[in-house]
Regions:
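N-terminal secretory signal peptides and thylakoid transit peptides that target proteins
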Residues: 4-25
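Boundary at the C-terminal end of the N-terminal hydrophobic targeting segment
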Residues: 33-37
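N-terminal catalytic cores of secreted or lumenal carbohydrate-active enzymes
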Residues: 38-141, 150
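Catalytic grooves of carbohydrate-active enzymes
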Residues: 47, 52-58, 152, 208, ...
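Alpha-helical scaffolding within the catalytic cores
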Residues: 75, 102-113, 192-200, 230-244
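Acidic, His- and aromatic-enriched active-site or binding-groove loops in soluble protein domains
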Residues: 107-121, 178-193, 203-206
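CE4/NodB-like, metal-dependent polysaccharide N-deacetylase domain
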Residues: 139-172, 176-179, 236-258
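C-terminal (or distal) subdomains of carbohydrate-active enzymes
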Residues: 173-176, 212, 224-233, 241, ...
Length: 890
């Protein structure tokens, strides 16, 4: 219709006005018919922008990754400067160190924005780690070191367990996070409750507010669009917010962790978020949006929760897992980490004792070196590093500081500390000293490196092919001793014909002479058969369906894979040898792909542990290899080690009182256990082979997920090429699980006594003794006290005793960061009530102090000289997502 002259003349809309009008109409249409919450209209949305990298390297080196991270966070900081409506959260100490190193002039600005509450230092931990693969003490140190760093550098303590990229959350996280004094636990995957806010509860009863709102980088159109959002895009955004209504507890606003996918930058449209909010405000939805920090959201819900106006569900136990390839691959990084963390904990213990009880020479507690070692272990807990899921340049690089460098630095530090501390405690001589870092009397089989041609006086011992000595010395709890050497070699095991039955104090075992499989294992005590089919059969498998996703990230469970070969397909050459300590059975043959396979099984005359070592060579690409142990009896319950405890779930028959997750591929720390319906059970121990799965009566241990490349980059540690030596162990028991001492046996398998050469023969001396229901994970010096940390290990409430046999004054129980809970009267023996899997921290005052250490703000002192140039290389244009590879070496 032609416009009437009487109608007012309207000027044409410019583009932004047109977009705003269209947006308003779209939002209005989108909310028609949407249910109103409590009759008050749609709930407010808190958008929390964040940047999510793999800060120690994923698709590039450590040195280059930190440039990406620094520049990307500065991109967010620029938007805070330029737009009064923008806010974001910043995570990981090493990212701030990168900003300090490359653009130190921006640090005052960052501190200003933190004070203005437009930037929040959100993560209490030193970095965003995988929480499922380290020991408990390493995970706690990650939090302690992070909190101390922020307090020293920024004068504040972050309030959150920011775990947005973990791939499953274990049962002890509520206790660890609350023990660190944190207000809430945040993760995004495998939320089983159906609500975005709930209480998470650990086995000891500790609970923490938990936020699991969806993905960690949602509402992506706001950030990734190159133009103002049009009506259709805004309509989709409105529907996305609507979808959050049903999963957000009634009465609570909506939380969205916002960004444009991994490595998210500030919105590409420079006028966002202000212009976006203007667009949104002209719509008719009535839904308010605020770009906020996490604390602004938590501050909004906490009073309402406390007043009972927001009802929350409760989750006991952990969650399911995903990205399951992470638990089964790159044994090199996982075993190195395990070895180093146990060595570091032992070094702290012996150094503590030596600094207080040295008799041969004075010993100063090496506080700086041990602190530095923990900082480097924190870096190697970075998610993609410890998962083993990254380009090879993250692990070994000729140009850049890498994970191997950090492992080597920690190894050197712990060896030097153990040697010097041990020598200050024990008199010089021509014998050897031993230090047992475990808090119980032990007599497990161990391998010792002794001077050539010697053995231990008065103790059965046998010579191993690698030149070490196999023996079983008895040692007291957390003790030192000096043992006399016999100047004659240990016995060489006698090669014999493989007997029909191998008999030890604990087992009757039979091996297949053709395949090398363990075909029968009977309890000596009950004559009960433990195996339902040949065991320690090594099986090669591949996914049944062609995978679209990267197999170094995703791996289906065993029922969705095809068996392509096994160690029983080809004949094996068998060898049996009997020594004074053990039977050793070896089977050699050819495996899938044509590579050699060597299996060694060691059955000890006087130990229930059976040790295995499987060597694989040149495993073909895209192949999963497992060791299977089919059992003869139904499995009633499954337990598996997690940081500072264990997960406990039902198997054959559901049990609502057991909350542990048991299905599919799961991560394990040190041990998994399968309790039989009729009593007794079977456990698998590991030194870093962290993947387990059980189907029916058959547990499997994952050995290799062979992938030559990771997203286009070669990775020698992930590849099946070359030689792979993979140790593991099993043990069975006839009685109840709480008496079987499986956690203690797993610690023994992972931490042999420390050898101190060139010492005199001395009586054994114990320094800490405890009841058998706790495991001491840490003993170190800090300031004017000794920190002693232990955990109840049976899963049962009771009483613990701790006898401390070195001088100290006042004592108190603290939380994980050393804040006093209550004083304890000083005594030689402490008796404490403990809850199931409770973590207990004691501080024992000393008459002398060790220095309080400054915060780490540079990596140069740790980096090999030839790699310092790469550490300092800076390119201001690098930000956002590093590129994927093309099959070439980085």
């Amino acid at each position: 219709m032609k416009q009437s002259n009487n109608e007012p003349q309207r000027r044409p809309l410019n583009r932004r006005e047109f977009m705003a009008a269209a947006s308003a109409a779209a939002i209005s249409l989108a909310v028609e018919g949407v249910a109103q919450t409590g009759g008050s209209g749609p709930r407010k949305v808190f958008l929390v922008p964040n940047f999510h990298p793999a800060s120690c390297g994923w698709l590039t080196t450590f040195s280059r990754e930190r440039v990406y991270c620094a520049n990307s966070y500065l991109d967010h900081l620029d938007r805070v400067r330029d737009d009064p409506h923008y806010a974001f959260v910043l995570s990981e100490v090493n990212n701030i160190i990168a900003i300090m190193n490359f653009q130190p002039e921006r640090i005052p600005e960052l501190k200003q924005r933190v004070a203005e509450k437009r930037v929040e230092l959100v993560n209490a931990y030193f970095l965003e780690s995988t929480i499922n693969l380290s020991g408990g003490e390493a995970l706690v140190r990650l939090g302690v070191e992070g909190l101390r760093w922020y307090e020293q550098v920024f004068g504040l303590r972050p309030k959150y367990s920011w775990n947005i990229d973990v791939c499953g959350t274990h049962d002890q996280m509520p206790q660890i996070a609350s023990g660190l004094g944190l207000e809430a636990l945040i993760y995004t995957r495998r939320n089983p409750t159906g609500k975005t806010i709930y209480w998470s509860v650990s086995p000891d009863g500790s609970k923490i507010l938990t936020l699991s709102p969806g993905g960690y980088s949602e509402a992506g159109a706001i950030f990734s669009s190159k133009t103002l959002l049009d009506g259709d895009a805004l309509s989709k955004l409105a529907k996305f917010f609507d979808s959050k209504e049903s999963i957000t507890p009634e009465g609570a606003p909506i939380l969205v962790l916002a960004g444009g996918d991994d490595y998210a930058l500030a919105p590409t449209v420079k006028s966002y978020p202000s212009e976006f909010l203007e667009q949104w405000g002209k719509g008719a939805s009535g839904r308010k949006i605020e770009f906020a920090t996490l604390s602004q959201y938590v501050d909004a819900i906490q009073p309402e929760i406390a007043a009972g106006k927001i009802a929350l569900p409760t989750l006991n136990g952990g969650t399911a897992y995903d990205f399951d390839a992470f638990w089964i691959e790159c044994a090199e990084v996982k075993t190195r980490y395990r070895r180093n963390e146990h060595a570091l904990q032992a070094a702290e213990m012996l150094a503590t004792i030596a600094s207080l009880r040295a008799t041969e020479s004075s010993f100063d507690y090496p506080a700086q070196a041990l602190h530095d070692a923990w900082i480097l272990m924190c870096l190697n807990m970075d998610r993609n590093t410890l998962w083993g899921s990254a380009g090879g340049m993250v692990f070994v690089s000729e140009q850049s500081w890498d994970a191997q460098d950090r492992f080597d630095w920690v190894k050197k530090t712990t060896e030097q500390t153990l040697d010097s501390a041990g020598k200050s405690l024990l008199p010089a001589g021509t014998e050897i000293g031993l230090f047992n870092p475990l808090n119980w009397k032990r007599k497990d089989p161990i391998e010792l490196q002794l001077p050539a041609g010697t053995s231990l006086e008065g103790l059965p011992s046998e010579l191993l092919p690698n030149g070490s000595i196999l023996c079983q010395p008895e040692m007291l709890s957390i003790s030192t001793c000096g043992l006399k050497l016999a100047h004659r070699p240990a016995s060489t095991p006698e090669v014999v014909d493989l007997p029909e039955v191998i008999e030890t104090r604990y087992y009757l075992a039979h091996f297949d002479r053709a395949t090398g499989a363990l075909t029968s294992l009977k309890s000596k005590k009950t004559s009960r058969e433990l195996l339902g089919a040949p065991a320690n059969v090594i099986v090669a498998e591949q996914p049944t369906k062609v995978q679209d996703n990267a197999p170094a990230d995703f791996m289906p469970p065993r029922p969705e894979r095809t068996r392509v070969a096994s160690s029983s397909d080809q004949p094996s050459t068998m060898r049996a040898a009997r020594g004074p300590v053990a039977w050793t059975i070896e089977a050699s043959g050819t495996f899938y792909g044509g590579g050699a396979i060597h299996r060694r099984v060691r059955l000890y005359h006087d130990s229930p542990r059976i040790d295995f070592e499987t060597e694989l060579n040149d495993v073909p690409n895209h192949t999963v290899v497992v060791a299977e142990f089919p059992l003869a009896l139904d499995i009633a319950q499954v337990r598996r080690g997690i940081p500072f405890g264990f997960s406990h779930g039902a198997w054959a028959t559901p049990d609502a009182q057991l909350h542990g997750w048991t299905k599919g591929i799961v991560p394990v720390v040190r041990w998994s256990d399968y309790a039989f319906s009729g009593g007794g059970g079977f456990a698998i121990l590991d030194r870093g082979l962290s993947g387990r799965e059980v189907n029916g009566r058959t547990p499997i241990l994952y050995l290799i997920n062979a992938q030559d490349e990771y997203h286009g980059y070669p990775n020698g540690w992930l590849s099946g090429k070359g030689r792979h030596v993979l140790p593991y162990s099993v043990v069975s028991y006839d009685g109840g699980w709480s008496e079987a001492r499986i956690p203690q046996m797993a610690w023994e398998y992972n931490r042999e006594p420390v050898v101190i050469p060139g010492r005199g023969a001395t009586q054994a001396q114990s320094f800490v003794e405890t009841s058998d229901n706790v495991i001491v994970e840490a003993m170190r010096r800090e300031g004017n006290h000794i920190e002693l940390r232990l955990v109840e290990c049976r899963g049962l409430p009771g009483n613990a005793t701790i006898k401390v046999l070195f001088p100290h004054q006042n004592a108190m129980l603290t939380d994980l960061v050393g804040r006093r809970l209550f004083n304890v009267r000083p005594a030689a023996t402490y008796r404490l009530p403990v809850r199931a899997q409770q973590i207990v921290t004691m501080h024992l005052e000393t008459s002398t102090s060790v220095p309080i250490l400054p915060a780490t703000t540079s990596w140069e002192s740790f980096v090999p000289a030839e790699k310092v140039a790469a550490l300092h290389a800076y390119d201001p244009e690098l930000k956002g997502h590093p590129p994927f590879g093309n099959g070439a070496t980085f």
